[in-house]
């Protein structure tokens, strides 16, 4: 009965391990059996604690694997892990004895093909668009003639040369270049820092603050342009207080910075064309406006002169204003004299029969009274006529006083417009005279530079470094065979030429026969 309660004897062929020993053995087997591996899967449950390490899961439809990326390596990953992203992780397998699970230590990570990148790009675009970073209301107009243009691009390569060349051809401007990496892990932080750095420049500081920014890069694959799809770059472009043109890739390439920028250019050259107008077209337009201004000024002066003439003709002459009352005065004066004579004669005829009955004194009194009445009426008539003439004169003077300021203002405005137009035309003429001289000076400098380049690249500079030119019959000899067939060779050195004739060809000395062996 006691055997039922005793432990069976352990098998002699089965080794015994502690938990730690077995976990360590499993760890050594996994790490030794699997070296550097690449695992494809979907990212899930991403965790970023304060330590800076990165913890996440790699899963497919049948299994889940824990993944760790240490702090030092997490900052160098080319792709920022996000939940739901399909990636290919490169790392080494290991185990964590504390939880009895296996895991992969990730050293590098890449999206699993362009489809995964496009899916992640679309997800990021939708999230940023939901925040309003791509709204048309946020976009600002570009300045018409920017004094300073800031360019964020690589300092070497065709992009910056194309931009500078196009700006120089169209309208030379002050250009500030902020050199950045346009590809790789440093691209996004450097581009974002450059945009924010230009915006941080103070107005009126030692370094002029740009009026316009251009972020440019040449064409490339989706992976090459990925730095311009990073959230840090998009937010920097959207927060920029300086108008910004995005010129990343070719016309068919689209990045998220294109949506956040104020304008998108299909190529870096097109960005330079958007930034500034053509100077020669502006000068031609200025000449046209100057001619139009001259014509308008001449037409305005002609119209105002004609208006003055019309107003002068519409005014009545002084003689015509006084002629009517004067004629009526003369008429009534003539009639008054005749009427007085007739009245006196009639009254005399009527009074003569009565005179016999009147006493001289009464008659004298009556005549005196009539004479006084006649004098009063004469004076009253003269006063009335004088008042009418005075009113006519006052009316004429009032009309003249009302028209005089208008005439003076019209003449003063015409003189000011004429002086202003003359000054504008003088300035335009001076600028037009100076433009050909400046262009001629630039062309002369360019011609001198090309001549110096021609002299530097000429073969005579090569002769100074110890080389020589061999000619035969006036043609340059470039091979040994050509030199062997020529009768006379002419060798040109730095300080002159030397002719060399062919001598007799020596017959090669025959080698002595080999000495035989006596043995």
From Swiss-Prot:
One protein family per Pfam: tRNA_anti_2
Q: Which reaction does it catalyse?
A: Exonucleolytic cleavage in either 5'- to 3'- or 3'- to 5'-direction to yield nucleoside 5'-phosphates
Keywords linked to the UniProt accession: Cytoplasm, Exonuclease, Hydrolase, Nuclease
Enzyme Commission code(s) on record: 3.1.11.6
Compartments annotated for it: namely:
Cytoplasm
List GO terms (cellular component aspect). Answer: cytoplasm; exodeoxyribonuclease VII complex
- Give the matching CDD domains: ExoVII_LU_OBF (cd04489)
Q: What GO molecular functions are on record for this protein?
A: exodeoxyribonuclease VII activity; nucleic acid binding
* GO biological process entries: DNA catabolic process
Start and end residues of each stretch annotated as Disordered: 500-519
Keyword Plastid assigned to the entry: answer is no
Q: What does this protein do?
A: Bidirectionally degrades single-stranded DNA into large acid-insoluble oligonucleotides, which are then degraded further into small acid-soluble oligonucleotides.
Q: Which NCBIfam families match?
A: xseA (TIGR00237)
Quaternary structure and interacting proteins, as annotated: Heterooligomer composed of large and small subunits.
The record's comment on protein family reads: Belongs to the XseA family.
Q: What name appears for this protein in its UniProt entry? A: Exodeoxyribonuclease 7 large subunit
């Amino acid at each position: 009965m006691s055997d039922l309660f005793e432990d069976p004897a352990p098998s002699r062929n089965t080794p015994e391990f502690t938990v730690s020993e077995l976990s360590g053995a499993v760890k050594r087997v996994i790490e030794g059996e699997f070296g550097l591996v690449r695992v494809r899967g979907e990212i899930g449950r991403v965790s970023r604690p304060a330590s800076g390490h990165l913890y996440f899961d790699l899963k497919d439809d049948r299994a889940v694997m824990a993944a760790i990326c240490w702090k030092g390596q997490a900052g160098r990953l080319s792709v920022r892990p996000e939940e739901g992203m399909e990636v290919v992780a490169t790392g080494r397998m290991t185990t964590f004895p504390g939880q009895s699970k296996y895991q992969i230590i990730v050293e590098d990570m890449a999206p699993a093909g362009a489809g995964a990148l496009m899916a992640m790009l679309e997800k990021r675009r939708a999230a940023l668009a939901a925040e309003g970073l791509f709204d048309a209301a946020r976009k600002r107009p570009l300045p018409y003639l920017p004094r300073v243009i800031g360019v964020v691009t690589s300092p070497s390569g065709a992009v910056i040369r194309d931009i500078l060349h196009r700006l120089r051809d169209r309208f030379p401007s002050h250009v500030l270049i902020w050199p950045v990496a346009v590809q790789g892990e440093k691209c996004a932080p450097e581009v974002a820092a450059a945009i924010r750095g230009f915006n941080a420049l103070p107005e009126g500081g030692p370094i002029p603050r740009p009026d316009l920014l251009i972020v440019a890069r040449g064409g490339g694959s989706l992976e090459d342009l990925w730095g311009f799809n990073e959230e840090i770059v998009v937010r920097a472009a959207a927060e920029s207080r300086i108008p910004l043109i995005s010129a990343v890739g070719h016309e068919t390439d689209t990045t998220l910075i294109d949506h956040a920028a104020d304008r998108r250019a299909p190529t870096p050259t097109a960005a330079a064309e958007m930034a500034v107008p053509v100077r020669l077209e502006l000068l031609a337009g200025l000449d046209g406006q100057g001619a139009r201004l001259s014509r308008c000024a001449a037409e305005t002066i002609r119209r105002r002169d004609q208006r003055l003439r019309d107003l002068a003709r519409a005014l009545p002459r002084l003689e015509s204003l006084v002629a009517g009352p004067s004629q009526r005065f003369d008429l009534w004066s003539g009639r008054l004299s005749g009427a007085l004579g007739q009245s006196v004669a009639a009254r005399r005829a009527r009074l003569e029969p009565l005179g016999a009955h009147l006493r001289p004194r009464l008659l004298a009194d009556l005549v005196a009274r009539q004479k006084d009445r006649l004098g009063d009426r004469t004076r009253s008539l003269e006063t009335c006529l004088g008042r009418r003439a005075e009113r006519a004169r006052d009316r004429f003077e009032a009309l003249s006083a009302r028209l005089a300021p208008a005439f003076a203002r019209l003449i003063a405005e015409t003189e000011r417009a004429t002086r202003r137009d003359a000054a504008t035309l003088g300035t335009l003429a001076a600028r037009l005279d100076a433009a050909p001289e400046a262009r001629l000076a630039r062309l002369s400098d360019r011609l001198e530079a090309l001549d110096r380049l021609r002299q530097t690249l000429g073969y005579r500079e090569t002769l100074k470094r110890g080389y020589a030119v061999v000619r035969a019959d006036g043609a340059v000899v470039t091979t040994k065979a050509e030199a062997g067939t020529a009768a006379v060779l002419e060798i040109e050195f730095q300080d002159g030429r030397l002719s060399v004739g062919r001598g007799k060809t020596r017959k090669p000395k025959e080698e002595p026969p080999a000495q035989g062996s006596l043995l």
